[in-house]
Amino acid sequence: MTTPYPFLFGPASRQIFGLFHAAEDAQPGNTAVLICPPFGQEGMRTHRFFKVLSERLARAGVATLRFDFYGTGDSPGDEDDGELDGWRRDLCTAHEELRRRAPASRIVWVGARLGGTLAVLAARNGRCDPARLVLWEPVIDGRRYARLLREQHVAAIDTTFCIPDLAWRRELSREPGAMPEEALGTSLSPTLRTQLAALTPESLALTALHETLVLTGPDDEQTAQWAAEQQSRYMPVRLAYFQHRLDWTSDPYPNSAMVPADALNRLQGALHE
């Protein structure tokens, strides 16, 4: 198995940390994959999952680049620097780096949660040219997402302390739509909170420049409606329902697998279908 190569890339003023998994037995015209990771605790929760997926893809002849957005993970910068416009540019920087390392490849972006949202935003600006987007439960409603993060944050506090601090739940009930300054150990900058508040399904229009596959659960009516609206605009998008045993924000436990095999198989298959 090829050892992934860790490195920094991008402009000197905004370096990004990446891990490149070179393809074994690569052939001209092969697919290469850019992993667009989730935000905060969701990114930490899926770190090992995407590591295993990247290793599997490399063995199958698919070069893969994993990276941390500026101000997150092992990339330079502070959490307070995190915001969607900068991360969108980071994604295109990562795309250009993968193009440099796999020059003859068809590049597919695999974006999970807020990483999927950023993939939509980056792909439509014309600066980078993915052949395909695979969006795994993308965040299409920023306020709904922020409320979920707050609820999970309060639930984590409840399970951490012997005597739960009821002030957190009272605040959640009193201001259900408020944007959190912190969620599950990760700060949300003022700019990011403003951007999430403005994030709606209507603000995430797809383009016809690439194919898009959306993977989500069968009970996610909002994402299904968004995909249907994109199809009504004759965008090349397809919705596929997919259930898995990975809880985005919790530690692994019997009902939340760390690296569910069905999810690995589904995402690997999604590159070519």
Residue ranges and their predicted role:
Residues F39, A63-G73, V139, Q243-R245:
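Short beta-to-alpha linker loops that shape the active-site pocket of alpha/beta-hydrolase fold enzymes
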Residues T72-A104:
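Catalytic nucleophile-loop/oxyanion-hole region of alpha/beta-hydrolase
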Residues L121-N125:
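Active-site signature of alpha/beta-hydrolase-fold catalytic machinery across serine-
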Residues M1-F7:
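A domain-start/cap signature at the N-terminus of enzymes
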Residues C128-G269:
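The alpha/beta-hydrolase serine catalytic core
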Residues P11-S13, A23-D68, E97:
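Short, surface-exposed "cap/lid" segments of acyl-processing enzymes
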Residues V110-A119, E137:
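Gly/Ala-rich beta-loop-alpha elbow adjacent to hydrolase catalytic centers
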